[in-house]
Every structure is written in C-alpha cells, then in structure tokens.
Amino acid sequence: MAITNGSCPSLGFIYCAILADPRNPESIWAATPSTTRGQPTQLSSDAKGERLAYASNKSIFLRSIDNPAIARQYTEHKVQTTVARFSPSGFYVASGDSSGIVRVWDCVGEGITKGEYSIVNGRINDLAWDGDSQRIIAVGDGKQRYGHCISWDSGNTVGEISGHTQQINSVSIRQQRPLRAAAVGDDKALIFYHGAPFKFNMGVRDKHTNYIYGTSFSPDGSTLVSVGADRKIWLYDGKTGETKGQIGEGEHKGSIFAVSWAKDSRKFVTASADKTVKIWDVEAGKVTQAWNIGGEGNTNVQDQQVGVVWPQGRSDNLLISLSLSGDLNYLVEGTPEPRQIIQGHQKNITSLTTYGSSSGEETLWTGSFDGRVCSWDVATGTAEEIEGDRHSTYIAGLTPTQEGAGRIYSVAWDDTIRSVDVGAKTYTGSSSKLSGQPKGIATSNNTILVASSDNIELLKDGQKQGEFKAKFSVTAVAAHENVAAIGGDDSTVQICDVSGSSLTPKTDIKVSRNPVSALAFSCDGSHLAVGDSRGRILVYKVADGSLVNDRWTAHTSRVTSIAWNEDGNRVVSGALDTNIFVWSLSNPGDWLQVSNAHKEGVNGVAWIAGGSKIASAGADAAVKVWQVEGLK
C-alpha cells in the first residue's frame, strides 16, 4: 500500500498523510516462528495448502508458502503468542497466547477480530477446530483447568476438557461425525473425548513413558497418532480410541515434537530433536524417507526439528519442518535435500543498513537481539543468515564499507566488532575486542568509528588505530567522508574531522534539552539530522552548525533511526512510538506518517529502490517495505 499525501485542516499550515491500514505495507518480510528448546512449536496450513500460520513474538504471521516474501501480520495480542490454526473453511484463524487468551479473526478480509476468549490462566499450547469450523478446543497450562471447548462465534461452552493432571501439549479433533477429540500432555496420558458437546470417554495412560508432545487424527478420521519425549509413536482407532499398536521403536534418537498427516491418510511425518524429519507408512509401520537437517553427524542444537506440517490441498508432496533456529525447511517427498530453507529473525531487529553493489544489486542487512545478522535481497525479499563465528547477543550497529569486494562491520553487546564478506555472506573470521559496550558504529573513508559510553574507537581492517575521548557520555555516532558527528547524553553534538587514527573537534552544537539518540548525515554531507530521546528531530548545517529546521516534533518517544534520501531533501525517521515519518526539508510542514508500523517500536529505517520506497525493521522481528508517494 502506498503512503499518500493529504490535508489535516486541524493543523492549519501543516499537511500530513496517515496510512489508513498499517497492516498492509507493500511487503512484509516476516519474522520466523518463535521457538523454545524442549518444546514443540505448532505450524498450520490452510485447506488449499497456500498459506502457513505461526506465532512469532507478540504477532501471528500468515505467510504464502509459494512466495514467502508475501505475508500478513496480526498484532492484536498483548503478550507472547504461542499458536495459530486456520479454520477448515479457510475464512478464520484462531490464535492463542501466553496469558491464556484465544482470539478468532478474519484472515481473508481486513483481519477484524471476531472474538476474544479466556481459556486458561496460563499458556495456550495448542488448539483445534472441528470440521464444521464451529467449535474450538484450546489447551495449555492452567490452574483450574488445562483446556476448554467453545463455539468460536459466541464463546459458549460446548464441552468439558477433563482427565489431565498436568499441562496439555496438543489437541486434535476428528473432522468427521461422530465427533471425537484427543488431548495429550505432560502427565503421559492421552485422553479421548466424545462430542459434541465434548466429554471424557477414556484415558490411555500406560503407553507413553514420558511427556506426550503431539497428537493428530488422520484426514479420513480412521486413525489417531501420538508422539512424545519417549521417542515412541502410538496408533489408535480414530472412532473408538482403542490402541492399534506402536511403530518405529528406536527409529528416532531424540524426543519427537510434532506429527502431521498426508492428505491420503496413509502416511504421516514426524519431527524430532535428533534433527531428523521422517515420513512413515502407516500400514507397514516403517520409515519411507528421512531427512537429516544439517547433515549426518551434525551437532548443532539449533537444527533440532520442533515442528512440522504437511499442507493439504497441494499436489507437489511438499512438507514444511521447523528448526529450533526458526528456519523453515521445505522438504519434498522423494527428494533427498531441502528444496528451500526460509530464514529470517526470531528476535527484535535492533539494527539495519543497506549495501549497493557495483552491479546494481541492492541488499538490506539486519541484526537482532540474539546476535543474528541477515542479508536480504531487496528484489525478492528473501533472507540469508550470515554463516560463521557470529555474535552472541544484541547487535548494536551495522555499517558498510567498500573494502575488498565489500564488507559489513557489526558491533554487539558481546563487546566485539566483526566483519562480513558481502559476496560470500559469511563472517571473515576476524574479530576484535572493544574497550566497552558499543552504542553505535559508522564508516569514514573505510575508517570504522565505534561509539561506547566513554570514547570513540577508530579501527581499520578491524584493528584498532586510535581512540577519541569525548567530553560527555556518548549515545550515537555518524560519519560522512572525513567528518564525524558524536551525540551525547547532555544533548550535545560534536562535529569532528577524521584523519587517520584521530578525531579533531571542529564544532559543538547544543541541540535540545534531551539526550541525542540518532544521527544521520545527508548524502552530500552538507546537513546533519539529529533525533533525541523525546521524539524531536532537528537539522543543522554541517559547515557552521547553524540550525536549518526544528519543526519535526511528531514522534512521541525516542527516535531510533534516521536516513536521508539521495537528493538530500527527504528524511525518514523511526521511533519507539511504533511510527515512521517521512519529512521534507524544502517544505518542513509537509510530512507523511505510518502509524503502528512495527509492534512495540521501529528500530531501523532506510531508503531503497532509488528513494521510491522505505524499508523498516523493528521489535516484531519483521522487515517491511513502504511505497512513498505525494511528498515534494
């Protein structure tokens, strides 16, 4: 959706535009699913096999399976989301969160919430729809109860989920009549229910010897399967609940976290902590194909398989598994290697920069709270995680240089600076210890400036060349050619000349009464934009430090990122207030606004596509692209 200009008469001379529906930018490059070691993560696909639904941070993402760069985000949950399931009709999604709330919402229209229901006073672990798309059973960890059955439109009780003594991990409803349901949990029990209304029928407590993580009825309703931490797979009659037997003893070498059926009900797939995904023939009770994610002998815990779905309605035999790292693995039956691996961020994106190659290829680079750095192809919206010896925690800044074939330097709260080879998409292997926790990073003619609270370190090829002791506590740094700007918590900006291994103070600017939080030079270096902790943005001439504009005050909290377009007339800013503003230097009273661009805050903004679009990243771990129109 384009951001367009419009009039706001109540503001007199000020003209602004507000994006009517911020949930529909031109593109959403979605966060990957949130995962927790030792817990299953639920994946769901719609009846046509076109979209994937999953929980990530406090959002739910609906993602195109064939084009993962196309996604939709639901942001009405107030706390960490845990599960999302499409209704069989395909018109609605039910999603749960860590506070025990289930929300039902429209997934084909405007995303309007149709109902909000309190199920348990704890985490929702799973939920299931009946075949009529009328009833929902939601289960999890509570105090008074571990699950509840409701009608989706009214929340009225349509049964009782009883029989469990510990949290329920998974639930499934038979899609045919007579209605049946099954729930499994930490008490090693499978409870079978008759419905509707759903009520306890029988309990199976002597088959599994450890936590049961997953259960599912076959699409034709004939068979029920359960899997768990004891690495066992049990089959039951889908109508009566009677045990049919166990298959696959000893096949998996780790906990089995998830199970999903093929549409023909003759096969199902399992995902395990042993890093394998296996297809099973139900009648033969044997594995027909297995994938070892990461290869044989792989010891990377992040490759544990914690979720899987076999999308119905497709003819290409595609199934999708989830790694603990958040990677979505596209596996095709009959093909030994993954067809595709979808990568991205699971945690809050904390830094963003751009890199343009000599061949014209444009990439975005993002860093997140967990130390992950990803490269995004702007043309396709696909991400690639940078391989090698990565940071272990919060990425505080990224900056590009033209060294060699291109480098991206990153600094993080592990107090190190590392470099990435742009072409190879790998860390170069060199890292240097910093003198303190970094606040930001900038490039001045291939000299790297790293800001910490006490000083500015100057590095070349990743090696320290010198340092500059600031007269205030440093909060931000920016550079253009041989000029640097240093922002402080005393609301001062110091302009310095950069020469080799030293900085020479040139001009001091007292910008406001608030700490400086973001700095950006225009592309020709003539202007400097300064953002502060209260949401104000001011523009100064670099040559003499004179004020050019002080009218950009629409943000209501700390400005986190500022970027100029190539002609130096427009500025984009992002802040913790979740909003993005595009400002005009030639018409300071003319702006564009995107409200609620990123849930819980915008942390990075950049111009792409020759200045016709904006890329943004934020606390929701997503990257979004916005079309800009109407600003002069």
Task: Name the predicted role of every residue range.
Residues 603-632:
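Blade-level signature of beta-propeller repeat domains, shared across WD40, Kelch, NHL, RCC1
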Residues 55-56, 96-99, 139-143, 183-187, ...:
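Conserved strand-to-loop turn within each blade of WD40 beta-propeller repeats
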Residues 43-49, 85-90, 128-134, 171-179, ...:
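Loop/turn segments within WD40 beta-propeller blades
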Residues 2-38, 67-69, 335:
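A short helix->beta-strand "capping" segment at the edge of beta-propeller domains
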Residues 31-58:
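Beta-strand-rich domains and repeat architectures in extracellular enzymes and scaffolds
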